[in-house]
Amino acid sequence: MAQNSTQLEKISGSFTRLAEAFQLALTACREIEESLPSILGEKSEVSKPFKPAVTDPSNAKKEINMAIESPSKKATSPKKATPAAVAPVEATSAVDTSEAVASMTPNKRKARDPAQPKRPPSAYNLFQKNQRSEIKESLGEKSNDVKEVNKAMHEKWGSLSEDDRKTYEEEASKLREAYEEEMAAYNASKENASVADSRVTAEETSTKPSEDLSSPTKKDLIDFSETRPLAQASRATPDIKEQHAKKPKRKHTRSTVPTSNVEPVSQPQPSPDKIVSSPNPPSAKREKKKRRKSSMSSSITTPPTAKVAN
């Protein structure tokens, strides 16, 4: 019983301690809850990001356009010129403009021949010329809009009957025939002009050589004194090939000294120590080969003899 009572006391003491700790935790949580608004308020003032003032997009675009246009206007603003400087500029203005146009046009497009006939208009082009004023009046406020005018023109052309179209088509065909005739005449005249130009150039080239021969220049004339030393030098120094050709060839002559009185030259003979006899002369090798062949043939022809039992 005493042991049980001690255990119960220990358990009750632990419960009381837990209750005290729980109360302490609750009080700490309540204090934190009370202090949270002040802590969050202080942090929010510091951590707020910078936000620029919102402006209307239309005003922003206007400001950007003004900033872009202002330096260009300053750069292109004309200065007041003095009357003394204006006078020579006015005198040369017509010449400068013509030169500028002539320098810019050749790079873009070839100059058109004024004598070349222009292409005739089509039936639809003739219809446009006749009906453009009426269609503009019918459109009213939209008469200045090119897209609307062309659209109405196309619709009206599509709604025309075959008889109405024939008048424009016949007129266009007549203009086309006249254009073809004019173009044929233009091409023929162009070919004749090219043939005439080729003849003129051929005549000029044919007359040039005769003029050159008839009138020699100073460069073609050379003094005889300048060429004379060269000719003398060429005669005095013949070619190397001619020198070699003129040289006589040597003839090999035999000696007339009698050979009987001349002693023969003794050649050095090898010492006997240096002479080594060949161990196997070729004749000995041949005999050995013959013996081997004969022994092989005899072994093949003579079969082995069997032993007879006594």
UniProtKB/Swiss-Prot annotation:
Residues modified to Phosphoserine: S70, S161, S214, S215, S271, S278, S294, S295, S297
Region ranges (Disordered): 69-310
Annotated Polar residues bias: 255-268
Residue positions, PTM Phosphothreonine: T105, T217, T237, T302, T305
Composition skew (Basic and acidic residues), residue ranges: 131-178, 200-226
Record has NAD as a keyword: no
Subcellular location: Cytoplasm
Disulphide bridges: none
Pfam families (alphabetical): HMG_box_2
GO MF terms held by the record: DNA binding; RNA polymerase I general transcription initiation factor activity
UniProt-listed GO biological process terms: transcription by RNA polymerase I; transcription initiation at RNA polymerase I promoter
Residue range(s) of DNA binding per entry: 117-187
Protein name: HMG box-containing protein C28F2.11
Signal peptide (residue range): none
Keyword Phosphoprotein: yes
Biased composition (Low complexity): 69-95
GO cellular component: cytoplasm; nucleolus
Highest taxon listed in the record's lineage: Eukaryota
Keywords: Cytoplasm, DNA-binding, Phosphoprotein
Major localisation: cytoplasm
PANTHER family: HIGH MOBILITY GROUP PROTEIN DSP1, MITOCHONDRIAL TRANSCRIPTION FACTOR A, ISOFORM B
